[in-house]
């Protein structure tokens, strides 16, 4: 029987009255025990069969359903004395502070009450927040004298978590409840309690609802013992103390004993609701582990909302380590066969595909491509085994669904956590490959922020035709080459792709025709007609460029000369492409690198994403073939400089240290002029930092002048943007430089000095963290210590920044998740409230912009000039 579907129009939150709790309850719970000796639930105990059943062999005594089908039913415990609900302690405190201790009226005049009532009713009608009005009322109603009965009021304090103290007297929950009962419905509304769904005195409990057994199931351990849920443990404590309190009250026990037991009951009820309430020791197991009670089930990352509602575990997904594969397309993902055999795609059997489906069923679950299940038209699912194959094949007809293995060309979602932006989850096409790791094209690493040092990634397989079509259209990797953050390519060549392209296209790169054909074959590119002569690397690279491409730009290797020599550039950094031919310039990061690739950016915007994918696939394969042909290796010999260079660097650093000593002397003699807005000490520090910074840069320049750009592979990597920078090489070869902590020189440590090896008050370069040595020659112990201080700050800073930005992201996502751009280009929320009249104030999609600019005029003019020249 199908249920009647109803649409939820609104949700109201209120409080349950004691009568509601009793009405909802199917039985009163009085026995603190759970099961008898035979293992059956005890009547009126915490596992009473009327509260629902979890054992599949038993039936619920309330609804008659079996375990697994019964939703469970509430019970109730009548408390011997009232207790305060810890969740409402703050509200009770505010209400008591704002009402008269004698007559129970709000401490406002009739005129004020009427005015506030009207404001509240208006806000309720407009569905606006009442919080600011209620806050204002609580602040206004803190008066020493009741305007209605002239009674003097005493100071009421909340002693966390639930003790209410008036003056020096601690109010009992019964007295608190009596006071709350005196408040009229009209006054309750003013205090933020809607009398239609709640009364203030219901915040003090007289009846405790007992949740159904389905909410707190007991488990059977391997030893055969039953282990109860934390909530059940807590309810046992509440029942025991409640029973003792009742017995002591009936026996006329001394007031002190009754009050102690009452306090204990309050403690157990408090920790039942929230075991992390401030000012209360948490209830623990015998092992010392704190109990996980109601609030802990809902709160935080492991709680119900974030762990089970916002995020769930899903079927049809796989996770394994990733490895690089430069030979698959950027749109593809290599899937291990073992995964392809396990994760399935449902396919409807039709008269057109029935023969293929038969083949899959014939192969069965162990041979790829096969099938694991068949679903009959009546919804019954049949697992395919070698024994059941024949029967399934006989009965197979259109209308059946076959759950087949993943095969080449299937569309899947691929994701790497943390998913910080749109491109952390993209659609790829499957390539089933041997071995046990996912294979990923290296160009797609930047958007996922992936590397291959043990990263794992997730794959999700679509189960419907609509989702596959949607993903293929909107989510394929090639649709995300341009980042919505800055309008440039985020997918592009990295590391070897860039070094390889440089080696292939530099001036000295000339190849025999035989070598050209070998390189093109290795790259999997079509072979051209023979030209009967040697080829330049530029001619080879031109084969992957679109025929009518015209561009001019300066490459990454450009040294920013004062006057650009253009085509005469000695570094070949002036790139000119005319009608798809690379006329001059080298190909490096600026051409097709992630974040910087100008050619790639141009192709995406002018020729579309299909052309961009083809270019990227071909160019990267060509670069890899080029680097394999040329050979590329690096070692510490690349950072070797002659003795003459070392002496020049040493002299320069000694000179800088002497200048620092002169500055310190001028400071000590009072001859140093302070900079505007700076103290003498700040001026000295700034000048020293400047001198030492210049010293490092200059020593780097000296070292750089001895490097050979043509043969030194470390320099090639740095200058082409493949990996690292010239600063890294400077530090390896010449001088590591000043270490900084909190943006300044190292100044803290021992009393008035950084280390006991220096004199007190010493301000010299060495004593404040200047590392004179280079990494290659090695640091002395003092330099090593200062270097570790600087590095430690970097590590701590990174860890803190990650946590802060993660929390910030969560808050932003939660706040902005319902904002959309409507068909008129306005930003609206899910209620239709307009946030912006034009998206981003200018209506421009950053992904379609030119690095943030709506149009790059210089680039356009240059292209038109080239076209007209052509």
Swiss-Prot record:
Residues the entry annotates as binding Zn(2+) 1: 60, 63, 70, 73
Pfam families in alphabetical order: RNA_pol_Rpb1_1, RNA_pol_Rpb1_2, RNA_pol_Rpb1_3, RNA_pol_Rpb1_4, RNA_pol_Rpb1_5
Co-factor(s): Mg(2+); Zn(2+)
Class of the enzyme per the UniProt entry, highest EC level: transferase
Reaction catalyzed: RNA(n) + a ribonucleoside 5'-triphosphate = RNA(n+1) + diphosphate
Binding-site list for Zn(2+) 2: 100, 103, 146, 149
InterPro entries xrefs: DNA-dir_RpoC_beta_prime, RNA_pol_asu, RNA_pol_N, RNA_pol_Rpb1_1, RNA_pol_Rpb1_3, RNA_pol_Rpb1_4, RNA_pol_Rpb1_5, RNA_pol_Rpb1_clamp_domain
Residues the entry annotates as binding Mg(2+): 451, 453, 455
Single Gene Ontology MF annotation: DNA-directed RNA polymerase activity
Enzyme Commission number: 2.7.7.6
Protein's cellular compartments: Cytoplasm
A Gene Ontology cellular-component term: DNA-directed RNA polymerase complex
Biological processes annotated in GO: DNA-templated transcription
Primary location group: cytoplasm
Cofactor-binding details, from the entry: Binds at least 2 Zn(2+) per subunit.
Record keyword Thylakoid present: no
Domain of life: Archaea
Keywords, comma-separated and alphabetical: Cytoplasm, DNA-binding, DNA-directed RNA polymerase, Magnesium, Metal-binding, Nucleotidyltransferase, Transcription, Transferase, Zinc
Function description: DNA-dependent RNA polymerase (RNAP) catalyzes the transcription of DNA into RNA using the four ribonucleoside triphosphates as substrates. Forms the clamp head domain.
Family under the similarity heading: Belongs to the RNA polymerase beta' chain family.
Subunit structure: Part of the RNA polymerase complex.
Designated name of the protein: DNA-directed RNA polymerase subunit Rpo1N
Gene this protein is translated from: rpo1N
């Amino acid at each position: 029987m199908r249920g009647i579907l109803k649409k939820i129009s609104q949700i109201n939150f209120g409080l349950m009255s004691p009568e509601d709790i009793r009405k909802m309850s199917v039985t009163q719970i009085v026995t603190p025990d759970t099961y008898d000796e035979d293992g059956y639930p005890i009547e009126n105990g915490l596992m009473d069969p009327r509260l629902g059943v979890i054992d599949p062999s038993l039936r619920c005594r309330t609804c008659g359903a079996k375990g697994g089908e019964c939703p469970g039913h509430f019970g109730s415990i009548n408390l011997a004395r009232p207790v305060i609900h810890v969740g409402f302690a703050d509200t009770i405190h505010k209400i008591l502070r704002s009402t008269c201790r004698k007559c129970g009226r709000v401490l406002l005049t009739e005129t004020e009450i009427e005015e506030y009532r009207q404001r509240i009713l208006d806000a309720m009608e407009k569905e606006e927040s009442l919080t600011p009005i209620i806050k204002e009322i609580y602040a206004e109603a803190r008066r020493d004298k009741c305007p209605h009965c002239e009674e003097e009021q005493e100071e009421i304090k909340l002693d966390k978590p639930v003790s209410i103290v008036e003056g020096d007297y601690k109010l009992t929950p019964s007295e608190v409840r009596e006071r709350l009962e005196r408040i009229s419905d009209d006054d309750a509304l003013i205090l933020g309690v809607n009398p239609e769904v709640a009364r203030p005195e219901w915040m003090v409990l007289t009846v405790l609802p007992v949740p159904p057994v389905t909410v707190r199931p007991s488990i059977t351990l391997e030893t055969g013992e039953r282990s109860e849920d934390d909530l059940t443990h807590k309810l046992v404590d509440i029942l025991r103390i409640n029973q003792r309190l009742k017995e002591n009250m009936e026996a006329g026990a001394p007031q002190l004993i009754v009050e102690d037991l009452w306090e204990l009951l309050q403690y157990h009820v408090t920790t039942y609701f929230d075991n992390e309430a401030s000012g209360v020791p948490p209830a623990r197991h015998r092992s010392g582990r704190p109990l996980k009670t109601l609030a802990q089930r809902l709160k935080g990352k492991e709680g119900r909302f974030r762990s089970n509602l916002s995020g769930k575990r899903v079927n049809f997904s796989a996770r394994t380590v990733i490895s690089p594969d430069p030979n698959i397309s950027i749109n593809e993902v290599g899937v291990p066969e073992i995964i392809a055999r396990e994760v399935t795609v449902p396919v409807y059997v039709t008269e057109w595909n029935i023969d293929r489906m038969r083949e899959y069923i014939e192969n069965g679950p162990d041979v790829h491509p096969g099938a694991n299940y068949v679903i009959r038209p009546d919804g019954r699912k049949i697992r395919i085994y070698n024994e059941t194959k024949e029967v399934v094949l006989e009965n197979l007809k259109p209308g059946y669904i076959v759950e087949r293995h993943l095969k080449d060309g299937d569309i899947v979602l691929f994701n790497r956590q943390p998913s910080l932006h749109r491109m952390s989850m993209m659609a790829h096409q499957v390539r089933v490959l041997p071995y046990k790791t996912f294979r990923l094209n290296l160009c797609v690493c930047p958007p996922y922020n992936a590397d291959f040092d043990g990263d794992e990634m997730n794959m999700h397989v679509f189960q419907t035709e609509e989702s596959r079509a949607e993903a293929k259209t909107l989510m394929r990797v090639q649709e995300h080459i341009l980042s919505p953050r800055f309008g440039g390519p985020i997918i592009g060549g990295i590391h070897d792709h860039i070094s390889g392209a440089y080696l292939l296209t530099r001036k000295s790169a000339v190849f025999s025709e035989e070598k050209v054909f070998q390189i093109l074959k290795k790259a999997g590119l079509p072979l051209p007609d023979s030209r009967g002569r040697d080829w330049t690397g530029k001619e080879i690279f031109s084969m992957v460029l679109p025929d009518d491409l015209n561009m001019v730009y300066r490459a990454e290797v450009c040294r920013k000369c004062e006057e650009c020599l253009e085509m005469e550039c000695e570094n070949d950094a002036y790139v000119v492409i005319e009608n798809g031919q690379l006329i001059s310039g080298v190909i490096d990061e600026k051409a097709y690198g992630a974040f910087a690739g100008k050619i790639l950016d141009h192709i995406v915007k002018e020729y579309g994403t299909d052309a961009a994918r083809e270019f990227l696939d071909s160019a990267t394969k060509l670069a890899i073939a080029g680097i394999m042909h040329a050979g590329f290796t690096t070692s510490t010999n690349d950072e070797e400089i002659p003795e003459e260079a070392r002496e020049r660097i040493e002299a320069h650093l000694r000179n800088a240290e002497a200048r620092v000593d002169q500055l310190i002397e001028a400071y000590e003699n009072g001859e140093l002029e302070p900079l505007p807005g700076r103290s003498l000490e700040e001026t000295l520090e700034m000048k020293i930092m400047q001198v030492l910074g210049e010293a490092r840069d200059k020593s780097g320049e000296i070292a750089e002048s001895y490097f050979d750009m043509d043969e030194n592979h470390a320099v090639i990597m740095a200058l082409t943007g493949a990996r690292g920078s010239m600063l890294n090489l400077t530090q390896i070869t010449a001088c590591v430089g000043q270490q900084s902590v909190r943006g300044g020189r190292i100044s803290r440590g021992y009393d008035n000095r950084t280390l006991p090896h220096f004199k007190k008050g010493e301000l010299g370069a060495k004593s404040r963290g200047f590392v004179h040595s280079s990494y290659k020659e090695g640091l002395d112990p003092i330099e090593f210590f200062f270097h570790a201080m600087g590095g430690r700050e970097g590590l701590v800073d990174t860890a803190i920044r990650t946590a802060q930005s993660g929390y910030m992201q969560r808050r932003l996502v939660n706040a902005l998740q319902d904002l959309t751009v409507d068909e008129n280009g306005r930003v609206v929320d899910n209620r239709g409230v307009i946030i912006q009249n034009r998206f981003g104030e200018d209506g421009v999609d950053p992904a379609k912009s030119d690095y943030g600019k709506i149009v790059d005029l210089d680039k356009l003019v240059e292209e038109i000039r080239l076209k007209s020249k052509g």
